[in-house]
Amino acid sequence: MTAPSQVLKIRRPDDWHVHLRDGDMLKTVVPYTSEIYGRAIVMPNLASPITTVDAAIAYRQRILDAVPAGHDFTPLMTCYLTDSLDADELERGFHEGVFTAAKLYPANATTNSSHGVTSVDAIMPVLERMEKLGMPLLVHGEVTHADVDIFDREARFIDTVMEPLRQRLTALKVVFEHITTKDAAQYVRDGNDYLAATITPQHLMFNRNDMLVGGIRPHLYCLPILKRNIHQQALRELVASGFTRAFLGTDSAPHSRHRKETSCGCAGCFNAPSALGSYAAVFEEMNALAHFEAFCSLNGPQFYGLPVNTGWVELVRDEQQIPENIALADDSLVPFLAGETVRWSVKK
């Protein structure tokens, strides 16, 4: 019997979906991402959404100012799509290398999404321009109608929004972000080379029982919400198969402790400190470590048409405890897996 590997050496990974926030929170959380990842697709859903080239340039600079010396990190900026967005502004940002992609939030689907798109028809001229440019569309794939159960939002989105959109714009590059259901896993698997998906560590590791049985665990509450076990298993099987159009996107989404542990708590898991080791544990459990590097470091660049990072990262089998909290200026931040022992960690 072969002894389990003690070290995993992979090309430096990228995070294809992260929330870095702004202000003091940004300064606190950026180093957890910039230390490990070469690049990250930065979500534009600030309190004032990133909808212009100038706003994206200014936000990118604030991120870079928060990157510690010695970290080689490139934030990849995204444009927040709204019903009134100017297609020329989007194209200018793409040509100038400011915008890597554009993000579609259905209105009120998640944090700071009230400015989001009310219907795909409202932004069709923008999407048609993106198709011509070869600019990726990043999609939070949930419908938000009041009559749709929260656990059914993703599956309904596929039928009513995603598939009709892709039938209309057959050459539009689409990333179905943070997929959570067997429906989405099958849909992406059956899709063509213009369709890819990101998957978070929490949706691979946990299901809704973990969040709700024996007490509500607010630090597992995120959107899209954790689903039942059969969906978790479908996601695990997708990544374990070596499917090349699925890649790492943590959806790391920090909120201060008092905004999570409250009667009406915010959605999001701050998983940046432990995400890479969490993914490694899942791939190991699935006997799929042969596909781990591709998921973390190769599949994303291939879909985006970007070069693979030149550096390397090592993970070591070394049990470490995740801190209970991380200090903020006037509060604290509870990380994903707080207080728990993890078996894979990034070698410093």
Swiss-Prot record:
GO biological process: 'de novo' pyrimidine nucleobase biosynthetic process; 'de novo' UMP biosynthetic process
Cofactor remark from the record: Binds 2 Zn(2+) ions per subunit.
GO molecular function: dihydroorotase activity; zinc ion binding
N6-carboxylysine: residues bearing it: K103
UniProt cross-references to Pfam families, sorted A to Z: Amidohydro_1 (PF01979)
Catalytic activity from the UniProt record: (S)-dihydroorotate + H2O = N-carbamoyl-L-aspartate + H(+)
Cofactor(s) named in the record: Zn(2+)
List of residues binding Zn(2+) 2: K103, H140, H178
Family: Belongs to the metallo-dependent hydrolases superfamily. DHOase family. Class II DHOase subfamily.
HAMAP family: PyrC_classII
Name used for this protein in its record: Dihydroorotase
Protein's organism: Salmonella schwarzengrund (strain CVM19633)
